[in-house]
Amino acid sequence: MEEEKQVKVLTQDGERLLTEAETKRYYNLVNKTKELNEKGYTRRDCLLSVKTANITGNLVMLVPVAILCVIYVIANGFNFMPKAAIAQYGGLAPLYGLLAFLVSIAGLVVHELIHGIFWAMGASRGWKDVQFGFIKKNLTPYCTCLSPIKKPIYIIGALMPMMILGIGVSIVAILMGNPFIMLFGIVHVFGGAGDILIIAMVLKEKVEGRDVLIFDHPYDCGFILFEKK
């Protein structure tokens, strides 16, 4: 067992010193890699920069957001415009809008919880392998899995937050004709931008064997693919 001393690594966004939590995950990956290599798996790191993920991901998500907004307008008209919203909700409309936005931000915690629920289904130790945390630099919560999981479970776990909080809530908003609920849904469609890019990367990776495991990267943006041919 290697001594868990803090290490400096080169990530897609530059060199930096790992945090205590990242250091523990780093050594966990070292040990998991050894175990899987002994079982005949080969390792492949699949990474992208946070900047690329944010820019490309949000551009990609403009398509489903535009489609949802068009459907909303067809079904409910432009009741989200300031004058229409005030006519319908009175002077409380701005407050409702602010509240919807704040609840959307708070929903990021639920977003990560949904990741954890589905990934725990495929983790070797269930919930014990699911770790939650908070990135102070970006002011964002995160969820990661400490064990490699089957490819389908990884994809489902990555996709579900956007499907439930984004697409699902947006459909409810369209049916109810509620612009504030729609705001929540749209925020969480954009919130799934990085997840969609990761899923695309997983599907793009060519594998020769059927035994494929995906390991959430311990400190960088991306994942590690283990394949047994």
Kindly label every feature range from the protein language model:
Residues 2-77, 134-229:
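Metalloprotease/metallohydrolase-associated module, dominated by Zn2+-dependent proteases
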Residues 47-51, 85-96:
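Membrane-interface segments at the starts/ends of alpha-helical transmembrane spans
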Residues 74-90:
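Membrane-interfacial hairpin junctions
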Residues 90-108:
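Short pre-active-site segment immediately N-terminal to the catalytic Zn-binding motif
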Residues 107-120, 161:
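Active-site recognition of the HExxH zinc-binding catalytic motif
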Residues 114, 118-123, 168, 202:
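Active-site-flanking alpha-helical
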Residues 122-124, 147-148:
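Short, conserved, surface-exposed binding loops centered on an aromatic residue
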Residues 125-135:
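Juxtamembrane non-transmembrane "cap" segments at the membrane-aqueous interface
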